[in-house]
Amino acid sequence: MTDSTHRTTAIILAAGLGTRMKSRLPKALHRLGNQPMINHLITTARQVFDDVVVVTGPDMPELEKAVRPFKTVTQVERLGTAHAANTARDLFGTGDVAILYADNPLITAETMRRLLAARREGASLALLGMRPAEPGRYGRIVEDHGRVVKIVEFKDATEDERRITLCNAGVMCAGVDDFRTWLANVGNDNAQGEYYLTDVVEMAAKAGPVVCVEAPEAELAGVNSRSELARAEATLQTRLRNAAMDAGVTLVAPETVFFSTDTVIEADVTIEPNVFFGPGVKVRSGALIRAFSHLEGCEVGENAMIGPYARLRPGTLCAAQTHVGNFVELKNVELGEGAKANHLTYLGDASIGSGTNVGAGTITCNYDGVFKHRTTIGERVFVGSDSILVAPVTVGDDALIAAGSVITSDVPPGDLALGRARQTLKSGQGLQIKQSLKARKEQG
């Protein structure tokens, strides 16, 4: 970061339609780690640059909304990358300016800092390059004694140039005044009639040294198709898994655990295989997340045990020492310390006190077809198996709900509530019915 007279700016080009995505959604809004690609880049750029500006295309209100409160400018006609950058020239700031791409969401802050440092060490222009396993049709970076001479597109490259393994990633950084001048001089004398940023490189080379900062392919490879999006997701998940393990989290089978970028897991948490973390999850120290569980928008307290096959939905808070077992779903639930719901249960829009045990098959009926209603269960309550609590309803501390009950009225503290039909016995009729049914079956 710099003082107000030399503010650095990151210009993110995001006007591309992403036709290879085969989607109505702008390419920059496709998600990685449960947030739009462009938000990854903005978050990283804000760690390095003073200001961030996003260049959008026409008719992209969803994109403009997604990047608020950052400034946007619209490239009315899509006439190439240099044209897009030039659209934002009035927002370049007063110091160095970097051009980034919304479809390069995995560039790290460290790589951005290296780019900016290379520019400040005397380069007229610094750019990012990579050595992909399959260079394919990437533009090649032609160097002479460590200085970049030009970028040549694959289709225009000679056989010798095509053997160059250093490829252009498109990202570059220069001083604001020079950049404005170079952009103004980029022409469109090419088959597509577009203005390309790569043309800036030769201009910069005449003004001073142009240097290439190399970074791994996984950081710089573009996301232009669904398959490339999947590869980027795999790269991101590897980063998130490694970060979790480095922070003291045990992943029994790391490759099967999927995080969101905002997932917070404290040290000494153990996560079993095939667990998915949606947005907004916090897991406190000592918790155990068992296999095949799905968590989103929730918090899990210290030494809690979740799963296997549990689902925690938004608004759920499981306090310390709680147990949420197999095939239990919680939605907008406060589960008090030490409370348990271990089997085959749906609890929605409920508050459950500490020490309460919710038996197998219990359901809170929270929806009347129009409105949601809340169920409040006190501390140390025992809810018998196969109980139905029809909200709104309150069960007081130390109450006991008999198995199979339908509870429609409040239960005072310490009371026993039974809400089921009385059992009736009819001597011998069970055997008679079975024999009758068997006879009918034999008769066809």
From Swiss-Prot:
The lineage of its organism: Bacteria, Pseudomonadati, Pseudomonadota, Alphaproteobacteria, Acetobacterales. Binds 1 Mg(2+) ion per subunit. The active site is at H343. Homotrimer. Residues 248-444 are annotated as: N-acetyltransferase. GO terms for cellular component: cytoplasm; membrane. It is an enzyme of class 2 (transferase). This is Bifunctional protein GlmU. It is found in: Cytoplasm. HAMAP family: GlmU. Acetyl-CoA binds at A360, N366, Y367, S385, A403, R420. Pathway: Nucleotide-sugar biosynthesis; UDP-N-acetyl-alpha-D-glucosamine biosynthesis; N-acetyl-alpha-D-glucosamine 1-phosphate from alpha-D-glucosamine 6-phosphate (route II): step 2/2; Nucleotide-sugar biosynthesis; UDP-N-acetyl-alpha-D-glucosamine biosynthesis; UDP-N-acetyl-alpha-D-glucosamine from N-acetyl-alpha-D-glucosamine 1-phosphate: step 1/1; Bacterial outer membrane biogenesis; LPS lipid A biosynthesis. Its cofactor is Mg(2+).
